[in-house]
Amino acid sequence: MAFDLPNDFRCPISLEIMSDPVILQSGHTFDRVSIQQWIDSGNRTCPITKLPLSETPYLIPNHALRSLILNFAHVSLKESSRPRTQQEHSHSQSQALISTLVSQSSSNASKLESLTRLVRLTKRDSSIRRKVTESGAVRAALDCVDSCNQVLQEKSLSLLLNLSLEDDNKVGLVADGVIRRIVTVLRVGSPDCKAIAATLLTSLAVVEVNKATIGSYPDAISALVSLLRVGNDRERKESATALYALCSFPDNRKRVVDCGSVPILVEAADSGLERAVEVLGLLVKCRGGREEMSKVSGFVEVLVNVLRNGNLKGIQYSLFILNCLCCCSGEIVDEVKREGVVEICFGFEDNESEKIRRNATILVHTLLGIPMSS
């Protein structure tokens, strides 16, 4: 039996199901291959809004949507084998679940059951996501985030994360007070709740106005930095991703630096968290970030190790960071030369990534004192 694919899963450019969804700074999601080709062709506007993009547009992985897409084949196979009336029944079923969730007389056990089933429904159906939002259930979900019951808190955060997949909900959730709850969870929640809360911040931060709101909210950034320092692998990865999303907004870079993040990010990068290198690649654009990086002992060695063993994105950012630091310090130039970076850069001449080739060329010119030709 045939079934309809959710439009949310299709790239607006290729119209194909996305295999690696990424979020453009305009807030819209595209398949990485398609939007990268758009950017590499010299386009500096959003394909949908036509609004201008920065010279080097940031592409933020949409982990939540990717997870939904990966699960979709399994779910859709089960759904397609059901009678159409049963699929339609899920919509009427969702209304009963919403009623239970918002009812003041419902027990925690009843609310947990409703949340669990709504999370499952909203994962794959944008119309149900809109229905939940329009019904006023967001307030009830936010109240559950305040609960001392960790399971109830985790399910309510998961529901809010699913709702945030709708672009129209991103600003609305912030207006409803979700940031305060997220910050509290980042401070005192369970490990799973902290990871989901950080992922929710990433989803909300794809909207420019939310970047500013989140960044200026007391303790929001410091809570992420703290999670990066003491969290488990999942928590650290999600906190670094959230910081990356927030730091695409220039005013947030100083805030992140002022929270003492640079040594923590360097340590994370040294332990293999390459998302931390990407955050440093944004922080190096502000003066305070460069000053803090120059103070961290062994930082150049960490970046050189990424050049030798990292993925393409990590190499790209490491080259960029080294060039920024070398432009400001002769001592760092000498250290970078001693680490054999000139030779490493020559090895990138035939790299598949145009950005890596360009960054390597620029760094070599900086290290050798050769002006770049216009």
Swiss-Prot record:
Please give the annotated consequence of changing residue 330 to R. Answer: In strain: cv. Cvi-0
Its BP terms in the Gene Ontology are: protein ubiquitination
UniProt keyword Transferase, yes or no: yes
- What does the UniProt keyword field contain? Repeat, Transferase, Ubl conjugation pathway
Residue ranges of the U-box domain?
A: 4-79
Effect of changing residue 308 to K: reported as: In strain: cv. C24
From the UniProt record, give the pathway where this protein acts: Protein modification; protein ubiquitination
Tissue occurrence = Expressed in the whole plant.
Q: Can you say what this protein is called?
A: U-box domain-containing protein 8
Species of the source: Arabidopsis thaliana (Mouse-ear cress)
Give the organism's phylogenetic lineage.
Answer: Eukaryota, Viridiplantae, Streptophyta, Embryophyta, Tracheophyta
Q: What gene name is given for the protein in this entry? A: PUB8
